Amino acid sequence: AVIQRSASRREHSPARARRLAMRSPSSDLAPSSGLTDFMLLLMVANMPIQPTKSTFMNLALDEARAAAARNEVPIGAVLVDGEGKILAQAGNRTEAGSDPTAHAEIEVIRQACALRGEARLPDCALYVTLEPCPMCATAISFARLARLYYAAPDAKGGGVEHGPRIFHQPTCHHRPDLYPGIGEDQAAALLRVFFQERR
């Protein structure tokens, strides 16, 4: 049998019950502070962690480092869908594949299109560690990517904000939203060290 001493004493002593209620008016309605904190911790622990733009750029930087280890120019890219799911990630593979078009951006676009069985990726975002060259900028436009995030600018070989500025050409039929500068210092440092070691 369950013994409910507190309930019994309140029933037999109304005055005492009133005094207890005045001391802790919400004691029967709300959990203690410790229990509340515990419940909040449980809720937070079970909440899905949403990747950030920095998270995706850091993955692209990891791909750039892996490319450098293969003696490729350290450029990496990550392509994600509209819900933040990673569809593809890669670094430059021009040397490994003896393919001058195997830039990181081209690699992830090819992989994502193959994965989806589609030639266009209108809900997707591309994260890349260097401003895309004219070839890659054109591929980004053809793939109809929604957003482009790039880390470091490329005044010599870029095709977005430098050089031919592909997205501003009258023959360009799609221009993604542009977000430069995320991870710029890290990306620039990778490139600087890579080329200094080879001079």
Where does each model-flagged region fall?
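Low-acidity, Ser/Thr- and Arg-rich intrinsically disordered low-complexity segments
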Residues: 5-27, 32-33
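A short, polar/charged loop-to-alpha-helix boundary motif
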Residues: 96-106
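Immediate flanking context of iron-sulfur cluster ligation sites
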Residues: 118-130
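Short beta-strand scaffold segments in enzyme catalytic cores
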Residues: 75-80
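Zinc-dependent deaminase
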Residues: 39, 43-67, 132-199
